[in-house]
């Protein structure tokens, strides 16, 4: 349903390591403060506790190859494809009586081609926050679940998000 290349694996919040240093990386992003679903605009909640409140968590990811001439295009496309797939999962869960289902994307929200609205999010019902903005060390969590993320990317870009229900 999501298209070619997607993988999914149910995971446990017990495998999650939350680190201040993961959140600090957001501060050094060139888009810091301009994306309504990224820090410093996220709610101040205990994300570790929140994830443990869910009965089910699953990583959803895709890995897309890129060349020297299409890195930026693949980088953006991979983010949007993952985002839309996670939204489809949320809708499915909503339609099947899971009203608290929520997803977190891989990287910043890129739904708006011209960037975020100046005063508010242009797509408040569809935009999602990056998983790394919660403080989760994604590389460690993925490794604990047998998922290898090569960083920095070398020939392919992997986008990993999370669905919770």
Residue ranges and their predicted role:
Residues 1:
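GGW-centered surface loops in extracellular recognition modules
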């Amino acid at each position: 349903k999501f298209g070619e290349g997607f993988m999914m694996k149910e995971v446990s919040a017990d495998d999650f390591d939350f680190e201040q240093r993961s959140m600090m990386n957001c501060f050094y992003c060139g888009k810091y403060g301009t994306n309504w679903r990224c820090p410093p605009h996220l709610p101040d909640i205990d994300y570790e506790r929140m994830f443990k409140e869910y009965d089910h968590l699953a990583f959803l990811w895709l890995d897309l190859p890129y060349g020297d001439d299409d890195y930026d295009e693949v980088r953006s496309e991979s983010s949007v494809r993952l985002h839309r797939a996670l939204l489809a999962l949320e809708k499915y869960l909503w339609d099947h009586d899971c009203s608290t289902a929520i997803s977190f994307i891989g990287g910043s929200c890129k739904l708006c081609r011209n960037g975020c609205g100046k005063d508010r999010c242009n797509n408040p019902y569809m935009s999602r926050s990056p998983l790394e903005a919660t403080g989760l060390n994604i590389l460690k969590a993925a490794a604990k679940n047998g998922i290898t993320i090569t960083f920095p990317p070398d020939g392919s870009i992997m986008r990993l998000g999370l669905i919770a229900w």
